[in-house]
A protein has these predicted regions:
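Active-site beta-strand/loop signature of hydrolases that rely on acidic residues for catalysis
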Residues: 58-63, 73-99, 115-119, 149, ...
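Active site of divalent-metal-dependent phosphoester/diester hydrolases
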Residues: 4, 113-148, 244-320
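Short, flexible loop segments at the rims of nucleotide/cofactor-binding pockets, characterized by
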Residues: 61-66, 92-93, 177-181, 212-215
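Residues that flank catalytic or metal-binding motifs in active/ligand-binding sites
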Residues: 55, 102, 143-145, 185-189, ...
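Short catalytic/ligand-binding loop motif for oxyanion handling, primarily in non-cytosolic enzymes
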Residues: 70, 93-96, 123-126, 157, ...
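Eukaryote-specific, low-hydrophobicity, charge-rich regions
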Residues: 30-61, 74-84, 113
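Structured beta-strand-rich core segments of catalytic domains in phosphoester-bond hydrolases
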Residues: 4-11, 15-43, 91-197
Length: 333
């Protein structure tokens, strides 16, 4: 059972030093993960406005690229009246986002409850374009992860880790990015939410970018199995950045991913996802290599009645993220 806390324990300076000095391999990574309580817990907070959702639910999934501007990001999706928001790449105690708890700030602005989980403990300030936003030369907590915002209080939540070998840490064994040293790995958060038609399970996830289709297939298989154990025979909505097409040269085509058929074979449907590519140039990623379709909804036991791709460019022409948001409305049959 995942522990749910009011705040996540920080990493001590002694442990931080040992993490930075440790061998860069999977064995060391797994041992260090076991010493960081926040890696196996979730943080909850905020204030839910409703007791139960209706049988028609408005959902946004958005990779907010660190969430440089939490209040503006919340304001940008407010016209959609979301009852569930599935976030990826949210910072908590990072210098590049003013040491803020960006999930908490968004939840407050939207008057929603939240659950936040750590994907990575960041060991540095980030890449060159991110360092331009740093307000300090240190990270207060160094947390970076996923979140679920909800207009209702979750009945149950769980953290689902999708790997433990240290894909961004174990540079002795895998091609880790030297500009982004990290402890942790890809993960998902699942929450059971009450609705007038009965409980549903919503899932915020983020699959691996620095890997091929087989790696993401294995992660998605692990995710679906974990959902079956957590919320058997329940309507499910999964949303997030699945990094489809990454490391699939020469065309980087999302249609070559095998996870789509994997999900269909288990009763899931992808039609809640709007058409179109979901990436764009941003303040942190001003010159992306290509445009890609990375962000998806995957549902079981519910029906999509509307969907839309929502530009991340705000009313002042500023991109809030290198991903556009995806929005859908689902009906519970």
């Amino acid at each position: 059972m995942t522990r749910v806390l009011d705040s996540l324990p920080s990493v001590s300076s002694d442990l931080q030093a040992r993490i930075k000095a440790a061998p860069r391999n999977a064995v060391a990574h797994r041992a260090l993960m076991a010493e960081v309580p926040a890696m196996s817990a979730l943080q909850s907070g905020g204030q839910a406005a409703l007791d139960a959702l209706t049988d028609s639910v408005s959902v946004v999934a958005w990779n907010v690229e660190r969430c440089l501007f939490p209040e503006d990001t919340a304001s940008h999706i407010q016209p959609l009246a979301p009852q569930v928001v599935l976030l990826s790449e949210v910072d908590h105690g990072m210098a590049r986002t003013g040491q803020r708890h960006t999930t908490e700030a968004m939840a407050k602005a939207l008057e929603m409850a939240y659950v936040f989980g750590v994907e990575f403990h960041e060991l540095d300030l980030g890449g060159p374009t991110e360092q331009a936003f740093c307000t300090d030369d240190f990270n207060l907590f160094g947390w970076h992860g996923n979140a679920i915002l909800s207009a209702v209080p979750p009945e149950r939540v769980t953290l689902i880790r999708l790997d433990d070998h240290g894909h961004w840490f174990s540079s002795d064994e895998v091609p880790a990015d030297p500009d982004q040293p990290r402890l942790g790995g890809r993960m998902a958060i699942a929450a059971v939410l009450p609705t007038e038609a009965g409980p549903i399970c919503v899932v915020s996830t983020h699959l691996e970018s620095n890997a091929d289709a087989d790696h993401r297939h294995a992660q998605f298989d692990r995710l679906l199995r974990a959902i079956d154990a957590f919320a058997p025979d329940m309507p499910v909505l999964i949303g997030g950045d699945l990094n489809t097409g990454n490391h699939l040269p020469p065309d980087f085509d999302w249609q070559r991913e095998t996870l789509f058929e994997l999900a269909r074979a288990r009763g899931y449907d992808w039609s809640a996802t709007p058409d179109g590519v979901t990436t764009r140039p941003s303040l942190i990623t001003p010159h992306p290599d290509r445009q890609m379709k990375l962000d998806w909804f995957c549902t079981r036991g519910m029906r999509s009645t509307e969907n839309r791709l929502v530009s991340s460019v705000d009313e002042n022409g500023r991109p809030l993220s290198d991903h556009d948001a995806v929005w859908c409305r689902v009906a519970l049959d």
